[in-house]
C-alpha cells in the first residue's frame, strides 16, 4: 500500500535527480528497503510521504556520489555521455541534471513536485533561506543554460 501510494512522486523526484529511469527505479526500491529497515525510527507525527522523500533524497545523493566516483575513475566527461539535443524538454532535463546536488533537489522538489519551501527545508534539514537561495540560483543557472547558445557557454 505504501508503494502504490507514493511510488509516482518518489519516482518523479528520483528520475529528475538521477536522470536515468533504471537508476530512478533502483532508488525507489532502495528507499522502500531503507524504510522497512528504519521503521522503528519513524515518528508518527511526521507525514510518511515526507519521511519517504527524505530517505529518497539521501539515496539519490548516495547514488550520485557513487556515480561521480565511477566517472572520475573512468575519466569520462559528462558532456560526452549526454550531448544536448535540439528538443527543449531534453535540454531542460539535461540542464537540471547539471545543477549541483542540493540545488537540484531544492529545484525539483519546488518547481516540479510542488513542495512548499518550508517542507523542502525540513526534508533537507537546512534553513528556509538556504532553500530560497538554492531555488533562485537554480532558476538563474537554468535560464542562462537555456538562453545562451551552446558555443557561447563557459564551463
Task: Enumerate the predicted regions with their spans.
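Short, charged helix-capping/linker segments at alpha-helix termini
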Residues: 1, 11-30, 128, 150-151, ...
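Structural recognition of an alpha-helix C-terminal capping motif at a helix-to-coil junction
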Residues: 12, 26-33, 37, 46-58
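Arg/Lys-rich amphipathic alpha helix in sigma70-family domain 2
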Residues: 37-44, 54-74
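DNA-recognition helix of helix-turn-helix
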Residues: 57, 61, 103, 124-150
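Short, basic/polar amphipathic helix motif occurring as a linker/hinge flanking DNA-binding modules
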Residues: 62-87, 151
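Short amphipathic alpha-helical boundary/capping segments
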Residues: 91-100
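A short pre-motif secondary-structure segment
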Residues: 106-110
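Short alpha-helical "recognition helix" segments of helix-turn-helix
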Residues: 120-121
Amino acid at each position: 500500500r505504501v508503494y502504490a501510494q507514493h511510488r509516482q512522486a518518489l519516482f518523479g523526484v528520483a528520475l529528475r535527480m538521477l536522470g536515468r529511469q533504471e537508476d530512478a527505479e533502483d532508488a525507489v526500491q532502495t528507499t522502500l528497503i531503507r524504510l522497512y529497515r528504519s521503521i522503528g525510527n519513524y515518528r508518527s507525527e511526521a507525514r510518511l510521504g515526507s519521511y519517504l522523500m527524505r530517505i529518497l533524497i539521501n539515496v539519490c545523493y548516495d547514488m550520485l556520489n557513487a556515480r561521480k566516483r565511477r566517472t572520475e575513475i573512468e575519466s569520462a566527461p559528462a558532456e560526452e555521455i549526454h550531448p544536448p539535443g535540439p528538443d527543449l524538454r531534453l535540454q531542460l532535463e539535461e540542464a537540471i541534471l547539471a545543477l549541483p546536488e542540493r540545488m537540484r533537489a531544492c529545484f525539483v522538489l519546488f518547481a516540479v513536485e510542488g513542495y512548499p519551501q518550508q517542507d523542502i527545508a525540513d526534508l533537507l534539514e537546512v534553513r528556509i533561506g538556504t532553500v530560497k537561495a538554492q531555488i533562485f540560483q537554480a532558476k538563474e543557472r537554468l535560464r542562462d543554460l537555456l538562453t545562451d547558445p551552446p558555443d557561447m557557454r563557459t564551463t
